[in-house]
Amino acid sequence: MAILISPSNNTGWGLGTHKLFGGAKQKSDQHPVYVQAHYRAPWGGKGRRRPGRARGVPLDPKTEAEVVATIDEVARNGPPAARLVLEAARRVGAYNLRRARKLTPAGRAMAAMRARQMVNQAKRRKRRVRSK
């Protein structure tokens, strides 16, 4: 149910059950509240708009020695905790963790490249076996 809250000139503001609607684009004596600033679109209301561009976070600079030490540690103790892996994946841009765990375009490209490499390796192996 909506309640109409109206100034004397009846230009109309409305209060819905969950939101304010209608009203002023500019604050004035007739409209002391800038209603559009209080309006909240319903879920999915921005679905067809172009999404904002996420700024890539650069990877932490690592020296070769640090990388080697990390590899050795993983070899000794097993893979790091999943949270750390996801954090690294987010920094690389493979996953967009604000939404569902779907691959981002960068992650999709990386996965496609890896798949192509695997197919090409299999083809090369097949050729080597035939030529022998």
UniProtKB/Swiss-Prot annotation:
Disulphide connectivity of cysteines: none
Free-text function comment from the UniProt entry: Plays a role in the inhibition of host immune response within the nucleus. Interacts with cellular nucleosomes and immobilizes the host immune danger signal HMGB1 on chromatin. In turn, prevents HMGB1 release out of the cell and thus decreases inflammation. Also plays a role in the wrapping and condensation of the viral DNA. May also promote viral genome import into the nucleus.
Note: All late proteins expressed from the major late promoter are produced by alternative splicing and alternative polyadenylation of the same gene giving rise to non-overlapping ORFs. A leader sequence is present in the N-terminus of all these mRNAs and is recognized by the viral shutoff protein to provide expression although conventional translation via ribosome scanning from the cap has been shut off in the host cell.
Induction notes from the record: Expressed in the late phase of the viral replicative cycle.
GO biological process assignments: symbiont entry into host cell; viral penetration into host nucleus
Subunit structure: Interacts with the core-capsid bridging protein; this interaction bridges the virus core to the capsid. Interacts with host NPM1; this interaction might play a role in placing the pre-histone-like nucleoprotein on the viral DNA or regulating viral gene expression. Interacts with host HMGB1; this interaction inhibits host immune response.
Name of this protein: Pre-histone-like nucleoprotein
Positions of the pro-segment in this chain: 2-23
Motif Nuclear localization signal, chain ranges: 124-132
Tagged with keyword Cell wall biogenesis/degradation: no
UniProt keywords, alphabetically: DNA-binding, Host nucleus, Host-virus interaction, Late protein, Phosphoprotein, Viral penetration into host nucleus, Virion, Virus entry into host cell
Molecular functions per Gene Ontology: DNA binding
Membrane-spanning residues: none
InterPro entries according to UniProt: Adeno_VII (IPR004912)
Annotated site residues (Cleavage) in this chain: 23-24
